[in-house]
Every structure is written in C-alpha cells, then in structure tokens.
Amino acid sequence: FRYCDPIVGKDDLVIVISQSGETADTKAALEEAKARGARVLSIVNVVGSAIAKASDDVIYTWAGPEIAVATTKAYSTQLTVIYLIAAYMADKLGKISKEEYADFIKEIESLPDKVAEILKSKEDVQYLASKFYNCHSIFFIGRNLDYAVSLEGSLKLKEISYIHSEAYAAGELKHGTISLIEDGTLVVALATGKNLFDKTVSNVTYVTYSYSVAVIRLLCCIIKGLRH
C-alpha cells in the first residue's frame, strides 16, 4: 500500500484490519493514509493497541485472546464487522430496502447457531482428515466469495498442518492449475452460491474424470449436501 503511491485524500475512508493492533506493516499503511489526509477506521481485537490509538475511529471485535495459530476466531469476527459495515452503508445510501436490511441483520444474528450446527460434524471432519492427512498437496477452489474463503482455508491448512496447499479461482482451473493435480491430490471445492453452483460442480466433474477419482467423488457428495 505504501509503495504504490496510493490515491487517497481528505474525502476518503481507509479501513485497516489487525487482530493485535500492533502489526507493523498495517500501522505504516495507516500512517501513510493519514499523512495524505484520509480518515482511518480500524477494526482490531486488542483494546488500546497502537493501531486503535492512531485511528480516527475504531471498532473492536471483542473476540477475546487469540490463542490459535490459525486465528480463526479473530478472522470470523473481522468478517462479521465488515459485513455489518457494508449493510449499514447500503441501508443509509438507499441501495437496499429496509426489509433487505432487516433480513441481513437477522442472518448475521443467526451465525452462532449455524456455527454450532457445523461443529456437530466434528467426527465427519476428523474422519476425512484421517484419510487425507498424508496428501502431498491440497488445493482449494471456489468462485467469487468462495474463492476468498478458499484462500483463507488454504492459508490455515498450511499454518496448522505444514502441508503444501494453494487456492485457485475455480474458473481458472484449466489454465495451468490443472497441471499440478495428480492422482492422490486432494481438491477441496467450495460451492455455496446457488448461481455458480453448477459451474463449480462442472470443474469438480472434470477433475474427477481426469485425476483423483476417489477424493473428488467424496467432495462432490459434500457439495451436493450443501446445495440441499
């Protein structure tokens, strides 16, 4: 951010995100934005941290101490705050109706119950991990928001398991990425958006017939379950 001569000024808002509130690169970017006259809003977890103090405004995620290396708790709360900001802005600008805004907030409030439901699958996840823990490489694929989640999922897998992992946009799978997939490679396909579900399944089907048949079939069943 600092090295690309950012086009920001007094009419701009720069949002910086940091779990600890002490991240050196993020703090330097914050200082650069303020030097150019921009207003800075920080999203941090640690109260009274350097970034929080240096910002014009701050939203605390209140995730509590982050013990896990993968920082899943802090990441989830950061996303929640970003979604809430986006919804609030859309409402104030009249981009969504009051009913849509209310539905959005209702969905956010339902997240704890949905997380609890996912955690009920702990044994299934452990079973899958026991089958694939010795994979040489693991690839995550997804489209749009699923691609962003794939990037984060791949990062967390690397941090915790020390297994080589990369994430790719599902639509780009045939452009080079496919050359890295071989028998025994695990491909995790995310397909949570209804409008792009069939396209992602098409990617999965292509890899199924070409490479890791057993692995992809299993993941196909998971994806179909999500669809229904």
Predicted regions and their residues:
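Active-site phosphate/pyrophosphate-binding segments
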Residues: 57-186
